[in-house]
Amino acid sequence: MIIKRIYNNNIAMVDDDGAERIVLGRGIAFQKHRGETLDPASVDKVFTLDSPDAISRFEKLAKSIPSEYIEVSEEIVEMLHRESDLEIDDSILIALADHISLAVERERRGVTLANPMLFEIKHLYREEYALAERAAEIIHEHLDIWVSESEVGFITLHIVNATMEQDSQQLIQCVSLIKDILDIVGEVYGDDVDTESLGYERFLRHLQFFAERALGTGGEQDDADLPVLLDRADYPDAFACVDHIAEHVKTTYHVNVTDAEKSYLVYHLVTLFGTNGRDGCDA
């Protein structure tokens, strides 16, 4: 490992057989200079940033925030690899360190940033949210401060984003659309639903796929997959609700919801709420 750049005593960039890597370890760069050899045995953690853009963003971040935030983020990334089977992109280190530095400063000033998508995040990404709660514990262990539940939700999105091909703005747009749909459903059916039920989980999962398709990040829905075709006269609330959803998607996102998509949404609403909230159809 040849040192290319030193950020502080504990963090450096090295050339490792032609690959640029970020290495961390207590005192690994102390009294070291660019061009010198770094003993791999002194390195605790190695991160690979695959693009020049990621490397550039890391360098800007390393110059702008205290190294403790990068080190805490490194610990969190290690936890994610260790405690989950998710394929986590190491570039999450950059986004996490940046977010944690801002989140901790907000908490220290007594400022809580609202997260209007928290409910949807907790239910759509249960595994990732649990990992984000572990991340909050690590932040507390190292920095002696608890971040809010809203911040845990934002950390969840960073974890989800590190496992998906879509960028962070697409992810936020997807969750925002799901929230809009749930708000519309709530207007029609009220809040009398078991949000921990398997039926609700299936409904949320379908909304996730629906949102991805509506926003152009997923394939089309085939109505041949429907277990049963339903009649508008039998389920007026469900059809009216879906009409409202389709109009919202068209107005807000300029996307026409197909008949197949509408039929599947109706089926899920009827399965979950029944006729006017009473008589359901079999899942």
Segment roles from a protein language model:
Residues 1-283:
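A cross-family "folded-core" feature that marks the main globular domain of proteins
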